[in-house]
Curated annotation (Swiss-Prot):
This protein's GO CC annotations: cytosol
Entry note about domains: Consists of three domains: the N-terminal catalytic domain, the editing domain and the C-terminal anticodon-binding domain.
Protein family per UniProt: Belongs to the class-II aminoacyl-tRNA synthetase family. ProS type 1 subfamily.
EC number: 6.1.1.15
Location in or out of the cell: Cytoplasm
Matches recorded under InterPro entries: aa-tRNA-synt_IIb (IPR002314), aa-tRNA-synth_II (IPR006195), aa-tRNA-synth_II/BPL/LPL (IPR045864), Anticodon-bd (IPR004154), Anticodon-bd_dom_sf (IPR036621), Pro-tRNA-ligase_IIa (IPR002316), Pro-tRNA-synth_IIa_bac-type (IPR004500), Pro-tRNA-Synthase_IIa_type1 (IPR023717)
Disulphide-bonded residues: none
GO molecular function, one term: ATP binding
Gene3D superfamilies listed in its UniProt record: Anticodon-binding domain, Bira Bifunctional Protein, Domain 2
Catalytic reaction list: tRNA(Pro) + L-proline + ATP = L-prolyl-tRNA(Pro) + AMP + diphosphate
Purpose of the protein: Catalyzes the attachment of proline to tRNA(Pro) in a two-step reaction: proline is first activated by ATP to form Pro-AMP and then transferred to the acceptor end of tRNA(Pro). As ProRS can inadvertently accommodate and process non-cognate amino acids such as alanine and cysteine, to avoid such errors it has two additional distinct editing activities against alanine. One activity is designated as 'pretransfer' editing and involves the tRNA(Pro)-independent hydrolysis of activated Ala-AMP.
Keyword set includes Transferase: no
Name listed for the protein in its UniProt record: Proline--tRNA ligase
Species of provenance: Caldanaerobacter subterraneus subsp. tengcongensis (strain DSM 15242 / JCM 11007 / NBRC 100824 / MB4)
């Protein structure tokens, strides 16, 4: 492809609304342009990268026996109403009516559609197991689209669903998809962690996310270098240490206008780990008091799961409700003597603490030497805390590390949630009708592209891994007015094409600096430069990922470039 003909509108200035490297570079390198908030159009280079990632996904899915289909993006409401998810998705779901006033949505996910297909087409155990997948556009009306394609309202996703006769079969399908995902992300040149995760609105169990470590990631991950344990913040646990202390008598302490943990630490000169804080919530019309150690935060996703409610059904209580429940102003809530019907949710660490300090449910007072079991008991004891750096790994006891990550893939076992709701059954060998056991497996194609850029860039631009680069090689004649440079460049370009390599030639009549800057910005892995030394029969080869330049004889350059490309592709295979 000739750059003089390629639609590649590079930018010199950073777009004002671009906050992270991948967003900046996808715009600057001319991969995409913004159409509206959270909606982008892909230009030729961007489309080629998407296609490369999609082909890697297809190859690895097909390798595990999956079959590709294509479902409708427009979904009738009846399917989501059958599973009860028409309302669960809330405002994120794009809903619309046709001319006959029938409800539809633009698909945010496709569990219902795949299950509907299978319930109509699969009847016998002989048709199982089955894994179907598609690569298709999804739609979610994000409240605040940001970070380019990281959180957009329209995105390309590979979603797959496995259908098995039993849980043992699901385990096998799950492991197939796990292997496929590892190969996909390895081939894309990504460094990633596989973490335990919360399945969210999709339901299910044994949920794992493929996380690309990045400082701009929206997810928080806890991981252990010693044993390999990794989990996102909604699932991360830590080892709880019991404290072997003699229980002391409780004592009320006057703490005038001392409301926060920080103020209490300063006032009482005691470590924050000796406090237990009580947060009052409204949860689906009921009052919940949640307790965690004073130096920790409540993880509200964990709390939602414990209470079996949706995100929009949980909110912190206002001052009036806090006073009604505690009889005190905000800042003095505790577990002893709460008024009315209050569900007490106690973090699993609290029973192991001794002689801790809580609010007295009386303005300007706290209580010392409180102990779980002796002085109060919870209605629910569960892990509702966020882990922090240095907490001990629940598996091996080594210190945990905390990092941010970009979720690029998610696999989980749905079980029979959707097959039972939609009546997707099969007849077993004895003639018994049983629900099909399902798994769900997703990869964000756009996100994967952005994650690759986050891990592979420098101050000059993108550094594409060979497997996903829009082109393998760019041929750059420094001066197209020099007939010898031009002819040699054209000859090399055509011979590389004959070798089935993907090649750009920068045949534009612009300064050499512009050509080199654009080549670095768009990140083509190999640059062949034809300059003044061509008179001596020498051209230069430079890899985007390195600073060194290799001088090669003109007659050897095609062989050498082909060798480099093949080596780089092998490294990622």
């Amino acid at each position: 492809m000739r750059l003089s003909q390629l639609l590649m509108p590079t930018l010199r200035e950073v777009p004002a609304d671009a906050e992270i490297p991948s967003h900046v570079l996808m715009l600057k390198a001319g991969l995409m342009r913004k159409l509206a908030a959270g909606i982008y159009v892909y230009l030729p280079l961007g489309k080629r990268v998407l296609k490369k990632v999609e082909e890697i996904v297809r190859e690895e899915m097909d390798r595990e026996g999956s079959q590709e289909v294509l479902m409708s993006a427009l979904i009738p409401a009846e399917l989501f109403k059958e599973t009860g998810r028409w309302d669960v998705f809330g405002p994120e779901m794009f809903k619309l009516k046709d001319r006959n006033e029938r409800d539809f949505c633009l698909g945010p996910t496709h569990e219902e559609v795949f299950t509907d297909l299978v319930r109509n087409e699969v009847k016998s155990y002989r048709q199982l197991p089955l894994i179907l997948y598609q690569i298709q556009t999804k739609f979610r009306d994000e409240r605040r689209p940001r970070f380019g394609v990281m959180r957009s309202r329209e995105f390309i996703m590979k979603d797959a669903y496995s259908f098995d006769a039993d849980w043992e079969g699901l385990d096998e399908s799950f492991n197939k998809m796990y292997r496929a995902y590892c190969r996909i992300f390895d081939r894309c040149g990504l460094k990633y962690l596989v973490v335990e995760a919360d399945p969210g609105a999709m339901g299910g169990r044994d949920s794992k996310e493929f996380m690309v470590i990045s400082s701009v990631g929206e997810a928080v991950i806890a991981y252990c270098d010693s044993c390999g344990y990794a989990a996102n913040e909604e699932k991360a646990e830590c080892l709880i240490e019991s404290r072997d202390e003699e229980m002391l008598e409780i004592e009320k302490v006057y703490t005038p206008n001392v409301k926060t943990i920080e103020e209490l630490v300063d006032f009482l000169k005691i470590s924050p780990s000796k406090f237990v804080k009580t947060l009052i919530y409204k949860a689906k019309g009921k009052v919940v008091a949640a307790l965690v150690r004073g130096d920790r935060d409540i993880n509200e996703t964990k709390l939602l799961n414990v209470l079996s409610i949706r995100e929009e059904e949980l909110e912190l209580a206002d001052g009036a409700l806090v006073e009604e429940v505690t009889g005190a102003k905000v800042g003095f809530a505790g577990p002893l003597g709460l008024k009315g019907e209050v569900t007490l949710v106690v973090d699993s660490e609290i029973p192991q603490l001794r002689n801790f300090i809580v609010g007295a449910n009386e303005t300007d007072y706290h209580i010392k030497n409180v102990n779980y079991g002796r002085d109060f008991k919870g209605d629910i004891v569960a892990d509702i805390k966020s882990v922090v750096e240095g907490d001990r790994c629940p598996r091996c006891g080594a210190p945990l590390k905390i990092a941010r990550g970009i979720e690029v893939g998610h696999i989980f076992k749905l079980g029979t949630k959707y097959s039972e709701a939609l009546g997707a059954t099969y007849t077993d060998e004895e003639g018994n009708e049983k629900p099909i056991v399902m798994g769900c497996y997703g990869i964000g194609i756009n996100r994967t592209v952005a994650a690759i850029i986050e891990q592979h860039h420098d101050e000059k631009g993108i550094i594409w891994p060979m497997s996903v680069a829009p082109y393998h090689v760019i041929v750059v004649p420094v001066n197209v007015s020099d007939e010898e440079q031009k002819q040699i460049a054209e000859k090399i370009y055509n011979k590389l094409l004959e070798e089935k390599l993907e090649v750009l030639i920068d045949d534009r009549d612009v300064r050499a600096g512009v050509k080199f800057n654009d080549a670095d910005l768009i990140g083509i892995p190999v640059r062949v430069t034809i300059g003044k030394k061509v008179k001596e029969g020498i051209v230069e080869i430079k890899l985007r990922e390195r600073e060194e330049v290799e001088e090669v004889k003109v007659e050897e350059v095609v062989k050498r470039v082909k060798q480099i490309v093949e080596e780089k592709l092998r490294e990622l295979s």
